Amino acid sequence: MPLGANKVALFGVAGVSTGTAVLLSTATASSSSSLSFTLPTAYKQVTFGFYNITPATDGTTFEFQTSTDGGSSYGMTITSTNFVATHGEDGSNGRIEYVTAGDLAQSTSYQPLGLYVGSDSDESIAGELNLINPSSTTYVKHFYGKFNNYTSSVYTRNPYVAGYVNSTSDVDAINFKMASGNIATGTVKMWGIK
């Protein structure tokens, strides 16, 4: 969901440039164990839009990891931070907090994007993740994202996650999955931004 002059790309079709963003790929989950994308080399930024991603397992975590071998394996070293604003449907427990369960410190685990995602028919997670210069062989790969999810305990959670993949290797694939169970439904779109 690129902002500014790139907004028009939200309505584009794969491979058609509308401004500086190009919609490159769309993946739709249907009881999928994960959704993977091959990352392009021609873009300084890759942006992912997530639309109503619903888990099969109630209260699980939506997460990602990257690869340097075309997706044969996922487990690159990540350091990250994670904080969230939360508010209940009944007006209770409005707060902003750091989420230690959502950060990584030089870990090869999957990076959490949203915790406690609900699996009811009206529950899901939606948002945006930006990966900076994934094909660089000079710099680490910075990422930052913002999401909102309707939790299994009828709260809205608005997580913000940022960090870096601590590698100067070309990152060429990314994988999104739930920590437990399949992705029941939802769509992910990938844009390249020059």
Question: What does each of the following model-derived ranges do?
Answer:
Residues 2-194:
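Surface-exposed molecular-recognition determinants
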